[in-house]
Amino acid sequence: MISVYPAFYKDFRCKADRCVHSCCMQNWDIDIDEATAMKYLVMTGEPGETIRTSMAGTKGNRRFIMKDGRCPLLQEDGLCRIIAETGEENLCDICAMHPRFFVENGNFELAGVGLACEESVALLLSNSTPLLFMEDSASSLFDFPTLLSAMGCSLPEEALS
């Protein structure tokens, strides 16, 4: 599988407390992957108890219970209580990966960042040159038409300009 991503992809860093439209305040369902849920269920001390009381659902279908559209673990300072008290390695998969996404297409895995995130948009717009892509196994950059060609796709020339 060939992984392809925008050149700015590895520069993405969550703005956390500086984010105006935090994903933690959008009343979204925040699913908890089962491996992380199991960590939460056996986590000792006050952080573990707080996390468990913030969870709902059963095995394979666990999620955080939103409170007034906010993640219950989002602190008033805009930072995540899980990270602050137990470390980033204890985030569930969706919180650790958002807004990153992956799409498989044939032999390609296309990675990107969702544009519902203000930092993703800022990164995309921070460069006045055309969007360039990278491949994990190569250090060279290539443009969108080259990516399409490598994937066996084509668009009319006028659609690419």
Task: Please name every model-derived segment.
Residues 53:
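Metal-dependent nuclease catalytic cores that hydrolyze phosphodiester bonds in DNA/RNA
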